[in-house]
Amino acid sequence: RFRIKDVFGDVDHLEGGGCLYCHRGIERISKNHKFRCTKCHEGNRRGKTLLAAHKNLVSNPSDLDNASKYCGKCHADQIEQVEQSNMATGKSMIEVTRYAWGAQEEGKTMYSLRPKVEEGELSLPSVSEGEVVDGFLRTKCLRCHLDSAAPHRPGDYRAGGCAACHMIYSNDGHTLTQDRAIQAKVRKSQAVRKDRFKRKFAVKSLTNPRAYPVMHKFTTAVPSVQCEHCHNENGIGNEFEGLFSPANRPDSFYQKTGADKPVLYGTEHEFLLPDIHRERGMHCIDCH
């Protein structure tokens, strides 16, 4: 089973001036990324106020809209692969689902979330403009593509782009960072987050306070819990962990009986035996 040291290795906590005057204690993102904060996050390290220091700030340089600029000098090949992967484009999910609903011909890839226009690909139609299946895809199947924002509720916390995998979030959004600025923000939201595993918290996932990663540190030793922030439905991540989601019930049922029930990924679970590979301590990355 992964320990903190297995995931992150040695951790360096930074001190100094500029950004580190407020963010004292923040973890070095990687021993191979010994850059100034502003090299990736922009902003103004000499700013004397929050507004001045955070002017033009890029909160997630690894977002796919930013990655080619901030990560591409060293990781151009990886970015190109990720940008055309199914996790970014959703092409396979779109093709299979639209075919099953009778909205397109078999084997004809027409739509993508990141279309290659020169190859004749199109953006997936909006909910109002497309077929019924396109609305289903946008609100269900494609909720977890790399450009989408994650719901602010237990099990679903994550970043986007490269950080969706390489920046680890816990299921409850708890952070171990020693960044004093982030710790101050977390303390302010504690009252709101005290019921965070209850259904009444999960249903407000669009307005709940955001979570922060376990540490401000990249890793390639990605634990299964990170994969399961997206891969938790259709019997993949949840059953691997020994969780089974019962059939959905009408909202009126939950309003009367379930507001205080514990949920993960926005739903209740029954407990089953975990997958044998999980019991033996294996993680997704051991095979995938």
Residue ranges and their predicted role:
Residues 1-288:
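Short sequence/structural segments immediately N-terminal
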